[in-house]
Curated annotation (Swiss-Prot):
Pathway: Protein biosynthesis; polypeptide chain elongation. This is Elongation factor P. The gene is efp. The keyword Cytoplasm applies. Belongs to the elongation factor P family. May be beta-lysylated on the epsilon-amino group of Lys-34 by the combined action of EpmA and EpmB, and then hydroxylated on the C5 position of the same residue by EpmC (if this protein is present). Lysylation is critical for the stimulatory effect of EF-P on peptide-bond formation. The lysylation moiety may extend toward the peptidyltransferase center and stabilize the terminal 3-CCA end of the tRNA. Hydroxylation of the C5 position on Lys-34 may allow additional potential stabilizing hydrogen-bond interactions with the P-tRNA.
Length: 188
């Protein structure tokens, strides 16, 4: 199994800690005036999502996580699992609700998503950065209603709620950013 020295730590690197895959968020190399140098690392556990800080002595080795990211197309949800398919091999992978998490509201059939696999099992499902969804419910925009430029809430076809400008009507398709949950533009 591959391993990394603390001198090789970079943001986004995936390592094993307590038999759980983790991703490095921040890495700070500290060389005090007296004593041995060390790395102060901020880590997010991929299974639980917990963020913690850990210090490693300079030159210490850490096992690399056997984590693979693959691009798969979202097919459907059967109530218990979300099903994805590889366009090349047509192999299907089922992800549970825990792996999908809050991203379920951004999953659109046939959109390409990034799945993080550990030991062949999906642990994180990341939707595309932008999705196009239809507005199913929103207040009508009244003429002259310009007090407060915050817009109005709109419910999308997947159940996600996004703040949209006043001119957006029911039935229109909008482009939303899945990372921030914000309205980007109207799709023509």
């Amino acid at each position: 199994m591959a391993s990394f020295s603390t001198n090789e730590f970079r943001s986004g690197m995936k390592i094993m800690l307590d038999n759980e895959p983790c991703v490095i968020i921040e890495n700070e190399f500290v060389k005090p005036g007296k004593g041995q140098a060390f790395s102060r690392v901020k880590i997010r556990k991929l299974l639980s999502g917990k963020v913690l800080e850990k210090t490693f002595k300079s030159g210490e080795s850490v096992e690399a996580a056997d984590v693979v990211e693959v691009e798969l197309d979202y097919l459907y949800n059967d109530g218990e699992f979300y099903h994805f398919m590889d366009n090349v091999s047509f192999e299907q992978i089922a992800a549970d609700v825990k792996a999908v998490g809050d991203n379920a509201k951004w999953l659109v059939e046939n959109n390409t998503c990034t799945l993080t696999l550990w030991n062949g099992n999906p642990i994180i499902v990341t939707p595309p950065n932008f999705v196009e969804l239809e507005v199913t419910e929103t207040d009508p925009g009244l003429k002259g209603d310009t007090q407060g430029t915050g817009g109005k809430p709109a419910t999308l076809i997947t159940g996600a709620v996004v703040r949209v400008p006043l001119f957006i009507q029911i039935g229109e398709v909008i482009k939303a950013d899945t990372r921030s949950g914000e309205y980007v533009s109207r799709v023509k």
